[in-house]
Amino acid sequence: MVFSAGEENDETVHAKYHDMYLMNLRFLGWKNEHVVGEYTDGRIIMVTKESKNFMLKKVKEILVIANRDLGFPSDSFPIRPNATFLLFISNDKRVAGCVVGESITSACHVILDTRCSVTCETKEIELKNVWKIGNWCCSSEAVPAICGVNRIWVAKEHRRRKIASRLMDCLRCHFLYGYVVGIRELAFTDPSPDGREFAAAYTGTDNFLVYK
């Protein structure tokens, strides 16, 4: 969020946003949590569309913050009905990160090609077998995929602690009952530059899968 110090109106808005940020990230715990990961610095819990309304309400509050940080409209929730939500709860009783996974059937490989990059920037897709998905160029040849990562977010004060990687590991293990989603069965939706860096590092390739 951008504001101007010294501008009374901006400082008031910023103060309200900061208060909302702290309040929404606070998490005292639920009686019937579905814990899918436990660590020395916190735990990961899972929420689905079938979860209690108060649980889904908390997820939406977190997504408002995540959307702001990731550059999406704060009220944007383009999530399929079969979505799975994972929240990382730190030992200081705050939501430190979240990931949203959803079922997909196919995705496309990101293309790293100088000509493609120029073409995408000018929005003139002329290369054969190339599509544009969000901000990225990708192959028009779809490949099978199982799990789409709609959002992956970690609070700024908790970054560089492998929280995103642990969220992804848990998502892969618990997205489908009795099946661990493979790295090559994961796809990301229009990642930010930081998100692209993470996706490449986590999957071990710059040509990871994207979907829309």
Label every PLM stretch briefly:
Residues 1-156, 173-196, 200-212:
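Non-catalytic substrate-recognition and accessory regions of acyl/acetyltransferase enzymes
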Residues 159-171:
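Glycine-rich acyl-CoA binding loop
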